[in-house]
Structure formats: structure tokens, C-alpha cells
Amino acid sequence: MFTVLILEDDTEQQKAITKILEEHYNKWILYTAATYKEACNLIETKNFDLFLLDIELNTAYIDDLDCDGLDFGKYIRSIKKYTYAPIVYLTALPDRIFFALQELHCSSYLVKPYTAYKLIETLDYIYR
């Protein structure tokens, strides 16, 4: 089975992404996290094929860790089995994408607000 980790602190965004993926990729297994800490706990217990990461996480939900989606991307890349795993960043801050592309070698990114069509198109491109 194809397994996806969605790191998104906005619950409405998280639900929307999950709904889109469930409708278009109904055999995928989806896990969601709202914080860096939750995402770290999941990555330690599950195996993932794809990561969808919000760059800017609400610091009120970070559990005393001053970390964001870019930090989680660095953590992913530090794990040998995820060296080349696809990462798609979701952001309202396109100026931070350069780091994700250059340093973390993310597969793609989407600038918020994006459409369901654009999300599906991006994922289809990665996995065609």
C-alpha cells in the first residue's frame, strides 16, 4: 500500500487535503499530523512513500519545539530510507520555497490557495 504523511496545522486544510486524496487515490493510506512532534512520532512508527508538508506551522501547536515544515523536511532527509522520498511543500510563503528546492530537494510545491486539480496534477506528475 502507498502511505502518505500530511503535516498541516490548519484542520480545515488538513481535512480538505485528506478528502481530495481519498477521492482520487482511494487505495492510499493517509496519516495526518498537526505538529512537528506528531509528525516525528508517526515517522518513527510507520513507513511513508510521500510527504505533504506545510512550511509554516502555527507555533501555538508546536509542543514547545520551535520547528516548522522545513525542519521536518530536514529530519526526513536525515533518515537514510527517506533520502529520495518525494516531498511536496504546501505554503502561503513562496519566498521560503527556494530553500526547500535547493537544500531539501523537494519534489514539488504548491502555493496556497491551490485547487484540488492542481494538487492531483502535481501528485500525478510525481508518480506517472
Model-identified regions with their sequence ranges:
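Short amphipathic alpha-helix used as the core "switch/output" element in two-component signaling
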Residues: 62-83
